[in-house]
């Protein structure tokens, strides 16, 4: 693991430990995903496995969310060959901080977001300040829209990483929708993000991309008489237009397994 990512993720874990202790609610999961992905720079395909630690919690001022991915594949090409990637978002709730009320409104809360994205081998660091709107929609456990900056603080070519980039913006929609069919419990969850185009330090065009990662999963634990939502099995579909800012488009089904502890 490279130094910038190690520092960022170490800070994330320390913060999550502190906030979890004082959390109003907390959820931590281990995910395993497996599918056939494409290297957008060489166009070669490889079977890739992604191990993820994901955490979400709420406390008196708002909520926190982060995940850490470890990716490995069966192609030795310098891409996703044992690499780490992580994201962290802290949201400060105006409803909680300013005692704002959204009675009888589809809008549930407004939050100020501070986030970062960090990649290991590429030595990428992005800061994402912005605004998050949480919505009250019947049937959904959560539904949010987030608009942030996408501010580059990467090491760049001189630091042995991917080229530095100009700044841009991100729009993200995330949701969770639980439902039941014939006594079996399911959840449709995921997110869709759009990040606007930018330039890199070589003068190249980094295209705006659309990334959708919907997940349909079955509560296997419930079927086995375990606690609800503890063991989930399903399919995650990744659709990525202009993957990592290239001309590559990707549509990949993945086996998805999630364990909550």
Which stretches of residues belong to each language-model region?
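Cleavable N-terminal export/targeting peptides
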Residues: 1-26
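Short loop/turn motifs that connect adjacent beta-strands in outer-membrane beta-barrel proteins
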Residues: 22-26, 61-65, 94-111, 136-144, ...
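Short glycine/proline- and aromatic-enriched beta-strand/turn motifs that initiate or cap beta-hairpins
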Residues: 22-71
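Transmembrane beta-strands of outer-membrane beta-barrel pores
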Residues: 32-38, 70-74, 114-120, 149-155, ...
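Membrane-embedded beta-strands of outer-membrane beta-barrel proteins
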Residues: 53, 88, 129-133, 173-175, ...
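Outer-membrane beta-barrel transmembrane domain signature
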Residues: 151-230, 259-261
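Outer-membrane beta-barrel "beta-signal"
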Residues: 249-261
């Amino acid at each position: 693991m490279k130094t910038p990512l190690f520092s960022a993720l170490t800070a994330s874990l320390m913060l999550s430990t502190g906030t979890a202790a004082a959390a109003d609610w907390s959820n931590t999961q281990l995910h395993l995903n497996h599918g056939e992905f494409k290297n957008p720079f060489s166009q070669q395909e490889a079977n890739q496995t992604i191990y993820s630690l994901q955490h979400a919690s709420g406390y008196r001022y708002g909520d926190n969310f982060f995940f850490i991915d470890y990716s490995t594949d069966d192609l030795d090409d310098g891409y996703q060959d044992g690499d780490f990637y992580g994201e962290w978002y802290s949201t400060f709730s105006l409803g909680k901080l300013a005692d704002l009320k959204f009675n009888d409104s589809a809008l549930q809360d407004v939050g100020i977001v501070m986030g970062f994205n960090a990649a290991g081998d590429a030595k990428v660091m992005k800061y994402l300040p912005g605004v998050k709107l949480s919505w009250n929609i019947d049937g959904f456990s959560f539904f949010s829209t987030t608009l942030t900056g996408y501010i580059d603080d990467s090491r760049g070519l001189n630091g042995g990483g991917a080229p530095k980039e100009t700044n841009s913006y991100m729009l993200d929609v995330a949701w969770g929708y639980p439902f039941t069919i014939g006594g079996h419990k399911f959840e449709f969850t995921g997110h869709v993000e759009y990040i606007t185009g930018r330039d890199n330090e070589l003068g190249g065009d980094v295209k705006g991309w659309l990334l959708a990662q919907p997940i349909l999963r079955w509560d296997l634990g419930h079927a086995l008489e375990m606690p609800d939502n503890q063991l989930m099995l399903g399919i995650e579909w990744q659709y990525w237009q202009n993957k990592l800012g290239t001309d590559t488009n990707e549509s990949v089904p993945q086996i998805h397994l999630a364990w909550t502890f």
